[in-house]
Design a protein with these regions (language model features):
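Central regulatory/effector-binding core of bacterial HTH transcription factors
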Residues: 7-70, 129, 138
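Short, well-ordered beta-strand segments
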Residues: 9-13, 61, 85, 109, ...
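Short beta-strand->loop
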Residues: 12-16, 107-113, 175
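Short loop/turn segments at beta->alpha junctions
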Residues: 45, 99, 139-140, 158
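Beta-alpha-beta core module
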Residues: 69-76, 80, 95-96, 142-188
Length: 188
C-alpha cells in the first residue's frame, strides 16, 4: 500500500471496528505518500469484505475475522482482544471473575453472524455456545453498547471500541480468564 508510486483511486473495505479505530491511521500515511490520490472506505463485516476483494470490487480489505482463500494474500496486521462487558448496574459488574455458569445465565447482545467479532466470540465460547441465551444481535458496536448501558444484557466487543466507555465508567469490564478472546487483525 505505502510502496506504490501510482496515484489512482484506492477502494478499501474495512470491518466496523477497524474502520472506526484503525483505518484512518493507515489511510493518512497513504495520503501523505500519494498526495491527491482519491480513497474510498466502505464498511462491511468480514465475510462481505472478503467477498468484495475476491470479486475485485475492493482493492484491499482490513478485517477482524479469520479468512482462508487460495486467491487471497492474507497478512496478519495487528493483535486485538475482545472484552466482555456489562452495565455498572448489572449483577455481574461486582464480580471479580466471571465463570462459565455466569456466562450461561446471562442474556447476550452480540454482533451478527459473519462479523469477525462474532467469529472470535463463538470460538471463545466453545462448549457453551449452544446453551447460551442470545436474544439480540445487532450490526453496530454503538447500538450494542447502548443496549448494554440500558442493562438489557451483556456484550462482547473489541477493546478498541470500549476503552472510552470503561474510562468514563459507563460500562464495566468483565473478566473471564478461562475464555481466550484474543484475535488477529488482517490485511487482504
Amino acid at each position: 500500500l505505502l510502496h506504490s508510486e501510482a496515484v489512482s483511486q484506492l477502494n478499501i473495505g474495512a470491518t466496523l471496528t477497524v474502520a472506526n479505530h484503525l483505518a484512518v491511521e493507515l489511510i493518512s500515511k497513504y495520503m501523505e505518500k500519494c498526495e491527491g490520490a482519491p480513497i474510498s472506505l466502505e464498511i462491511y463485516n468480514t465475510e462481505q469484505v472478503v467477498e468484495k476483494v475476491l470479486n475485485y470490487e475492493l482493492d484491499m480489505g482490513m478485517i477482524e475475522g479469520d479468512a482462508h482463500h487460495p486467491q487471497l494474500n492474507i497478512i496478519p496486521w495487528r493483535d486485538d482482544e475482545l472484552n466482555l462487558f456489562c452495565s455498572p448496574k448489572h449483577p455481574l459488574a461486582s464480580k471479580k471473575t466471571i465463570v462459565d455458569k455466569d456466562l450461561l445465565k446471562a442474556d447476550w447482545i452480540l454482533r451478527e453472524q459473519g462479523s469477525g467479532t462474532r467469529q472470535t466470540f463463538d470460538r471463545a465460547m466453545y462448549g457453551l455456545l449452544p446453551k447460551m441465551n442470545i436474544p439480540l444481535e445487532l450490526r453496530g458496536t454503538e447500538a450494542i453498547k447502548q443496549a448494554v448501558k440500558q442493562n438489557i444484557g451483556i456484550g462482547c466487543l473489541s477493546r478498541l471500541s470500549l476503552k472510552e466507555d470503561f474510562g468514563r465508567g459507563e460500562l464495566a469490564k468483565l473478566h473471564a480468564p478461562n475464555r481466550d478472546l484474543s484475535r488477529k487483525l488482517y490485511l487482504i
